[in-house]
Every structure is written in structure tokens, then in C-alpha cells.
UniProtKB/Swiss-Prot annotation:
The keyword Cell membrane is annotated on this UniProt entry: no
Residue numbers covered by the propeptide annotation in the UniProt entry: 21-104, 105-139, 140-142, 143-144, 171-175
Protein name according to UniProt: Neuromedin-U
Signal peptide: 1-20
Gene name tied to this protein: nmu
Family membership noted in the UniProt record: Belongs to the NmU family.
Pfam families listed in its UniProt record: NMU
Amino acid sequence: MQKGSEDTTQNRCHQHSIGGHSTCGLLLLIILVSWTSICEGAPFSSPVLGAEDELPLWNGIDDACSAVLPDPQLAVSSTLRELCFMVMRMQQKSQGEEKDDFKRFLFHYSKSHDSGNSDITSSVLHPLLQLLPQLHDRRMKRLTSDEEVQVPGGVISNGYFLFRPRNGRRSAGFR
């Protein structure tokens, strides 16, 4: 029974042959591509095809679709045309995503490294982080390094840290 159905399928494929390429061959090629792993999540290599086998397959699909799409006189079903358009869009989208990833990589990892000169601030830094050297200079002008400020309650401050003796003990300098 299956042999008869295979013969009718082959007859249909031979009826729709296009310049040496049959429509069934193109459909088979597109079905094989749909088995490859296309996902938005973690990378996963297909058990059916290796990475080196995918490029010739994509090139073959691209050639077949470019032979079918430009010629409106060919008797090709609208479903096949839509499938070719979908495959072409997927290919363009994946190339666009690779470009975006490359741009993102370059943005994060192309920061200029200073040669020890702390006066030069990088343009990649956040604007508030660029103010840190100025704040440090202002604080150093306000308080000298050996001067300690005494705050009521036994708190010693040198501008950066607060020191409070533990357990209520006070040093002799505070009495």
C-alpha cells in the first residue's frame, strides 16, 4: 500500500519540476533546515548536523529560494514562497543579532586603559564617577591629614571614618 503512495508522490514531484530542481526536493531541504536547532535560549548544537554541515545547507536553501522567488511565472505554491521568505528573514535576523552582539562586546571591552595618569578620566565612566577626584581634592583641602575633629559623645573623626570607643570607655584625651 505504501509503494503506491510513494509512486503518486514521485509523480507529483516530477510534475512540478523547476529547471532541474524539483519542488519536493526544495521542500525536503526546508524540512531538514527546520530540524536544526533554532532557539532564543542557550546555544545547543543539533545532533543531526554539525556546525560545518550547516553552512552548505544554508547556502543550498538560499540558492533554491533565490531561484524560486524572483521569477513570478513559475508555478510554485504560495506556501513554498512564504516558507522561503520566512527562511530568508531568519537568516537576516541572525546576521543582525551577530552584529548587535559584536557592537555590545566592543562597547564593554574597548575601554581605554590609562598609562597611570589619574588626571585623565575615561569617557566610558558614569558622569558622577568622574567627579570623584574633585571631591577627594576638596576634602583634602578642607581637612589636613594629621588633624582630627572631635565630635561630642566621644566620636573621633578625621573626615573619612568615625571612631567611637566600645563599651562606654573613653580615652584620656576626651576627659
